Amino acid sequence: MDRSKVPAVLSIAGSDSSGGAGIQADIKTITAHRLYAETAITAITAQNTLGVTAVQNISPDIVAAQIDAVFDDIRPSAVKIGMVSSAEIIEVIADRLSAWDAQNIVVDPVMVATSGARFIAEDAAEALTRRLFPLATVITPNIPEAMALLDYEVDSERTQQNAAMLLTRRFGCASLVKGGHFVNEANDVLAEPAPLDDEGNHLGDPLTTWFRHKRIETGNTHGTGCTLSSAIACALAQGMDLADAVNAGKAYLTGALAAGFDMGKGSGPVNHMWQY
């Protein structure tokens, strides 16, 4: 590979002191894909495999300055957005990404941690859907997040697919609803907006694609959502279309889960470097 042409991927997310999720998981994932990782940190969290004990948001001005510094020099080919718990920070992220005409934006709507801790207030959730979702190439909610976004019960593959289609219709972006919270399955469904006619109207319902992978029986699941969304961003940065990018991201996460680390007293981390 020509080292002057290595794609960069920007992660806009919170820092995880235990290294298993957030910015740290994103950097590991991007590096494992042999791409160049850049960051804009939105919050500092004190957390480990047992849960989150403290969150300190970064000043919105500093978040904006980080994004500007990245785009002004080493422009990313894709952007992954993770934990953003402040409406004001969401507003500046949307403003800066719009100003720089950012492409290939993957939004992981981090609303609730695996441990159950809630990361986002109601006003921030509203800003997330109003400002960031319209900029996204794809959003990647898990089932609890999809239910919270839609106020809709998801308890089967049929309702999971309906949720993905509803999200795509409502927010205008592709939606990947992850099925890992089902007991016996790890199947995800992608809904993409239908093509547009000459007047800008969608020609039919969203197009859906299922991604079926075997469920890895492990308790080491810390950072799985961060890892998958970053892996999808990496694939988009390398020029894959969205469905292929999701499939590649799923395959990477499956390997990382299978090789996960038995570390800590709770939900341990996945092994981001499992291919090496």
Predicted regions and their residues:
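Charged C-terminal helix
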Residues: 6, 54-57, 243-276
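Short, small-residue alpha-helix embedded
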Residues: 147-148, 219-242
